[in-house]
Amino acid sequence: MIAANFLLNLFLYPILIKLFRRRRIGQYIRKEGPDLHGYKEGTPTMGGILFVLTGFLFGMISKTNTMVLLGMFLFFLIGFLDDFLSVARKDSTGLKTYQKALLQTLAAFIMLLLIRPDTNVDFFGSTIEMGKWYYLFALLVIVGSSNAMNLTDGLDGLAGWIYVSGSIPYWFFLKERGVSEDILLILGVGVLAFLVFNSKPAKIFMGDTGSITLGGVLGTVSVLTKTEFYLVLFFMIPVIETLSVILQVGSFKIFKRRIFKMSPLHHHFELIGWSEEKIVAVFTVFNLISSLVALEIFGVIG
């Protein structure tokens, strides 16, 4: 099934790229971004639609948890709407920031109402009872995961490789705990096929259709499996990218000074002269090492 999903995506992506080029479904580059990205304007976007839809298909075949599939669907709708508006308006805006945040919060709220999770958290082996505060915590985890992957999607291949380098070790970790969340692998191989066409120079971008969905799935899975804190160890790069934005905005508002040349962090490295390939390679290796160290610490390997 995993191999079939990979091959199906590998076969369909060239067709999708041709279709999107013909329909002029292309990326509009935001003006605030690095000048280096100007040549990417017009590259087909919304490529995440394929690995998400095949993820649904194989997820249903593998009898994936219904709540995970529902979460995937809700965040897919948000990402798709954002990309659709951007393409329709012929600019990079799509949904406004507050609109996207409201929709993500609503999606997470719906998920929590349906999941009705226990209100305790596993803090690396210690159980902490949070009571009603847990729902706010879980809301932040799901919305934060979705946004973190979205922020990471700024260079050719970056978000895809980060997802693969974290989701596969995370799957092994959950398997060791007796939890089967095969949707992580199903999406992972779909993303691998996508990366054949997304690595620099990218022939297609995943868009928010892909990145928001991937992050939403990760957050939902972590809440369902009570591994919210562990998730951070497998996705250190998205966490760092998010922190870089928070620090940059906070520093500028309070001290009128910027910490980085530009945020998220990958743009800072671009502006100090690193190539996209180098940034993607270094970030991916860092995330993979963090994931493998986590597996070693918790006795999954070694």
From Swiss-Prot:
GO terms for cellular component: plasma membrane. It is found in: Cell inner membrane. Its EC number is 2.7.8.13. It is a multi-pass membrane protein. The keyword Hydrolase does not apply. It holds the Pfam family MraY_sig1. Pathway: Cell wall biogenesis; peptidoglycan biosynthesis. Belongs to the glycosyltransferase 4 family. MraY subfamily. The chain crosses the membrane at residues 1-21, 42-62, 67-87, 95-115, 123-143, 154-174, 178-198, 204-224, 229-249, 279-299. Its cofactor is Mg(2+). It catalyses: UDP-N-acetyl-alpha-D-muramoyl-L-alanyl-gamma-D-glutamyl-meso-2,6-diaminopimeloyl-D-alanyl-D-alanine + di-trans,octa-cis-undecaprenyl phosphate = di-trans,octa-cis-undecaprenyl diphospho-N-acetyl-alpha-D-muramoyl-L-alanyl-D-glutamyl-meso-2,6-diaminopimeloyl-D-alanyl-D-alanine + UMP. One of its GO terms (biological process) is regulation of cell shape. This is Phospho-N-acetylmuramoyl-pentapeptide-transferase. Catalyzes the initial step of the lipid cycle reactions in the biosynthesis of the cell wall peptidoglycan: transfers peptidoglycan precursor phospho-MurNAc-pentapeptide from UDP-MurNAc-pentapeptide onto the lipid carrier undecaprenyl phosphate, yielding undecaprenyl-pyrophosphoryl-MurNAc-pentapeptide, known as lipid I. GO terms for molecular function: metal ion binding; phospho-N-acetylmuramoyl-pentapeptide-transferase activity; phosphotransferase activity, for other substituted phosphate groups; UDP-N-acetylmuramoyl-L-alanyl-D-glutamyl-meso-2,6-diaminopimelyl-D-alanyl-D-alanine:undecaprenyl-phosphate transferase activity. Keywords: Cell cycle, Cell division, Cell inner membrane, Cell membrane, Cell shape, Cell wall biogenesis/degradation, Magnesium, Membrane, Metal-binding, Peptidoglycan synthesis, Transferase, Transmembrane, Transmembrane helix. Its main location: membrane. Disulfide bonds: none annotated.
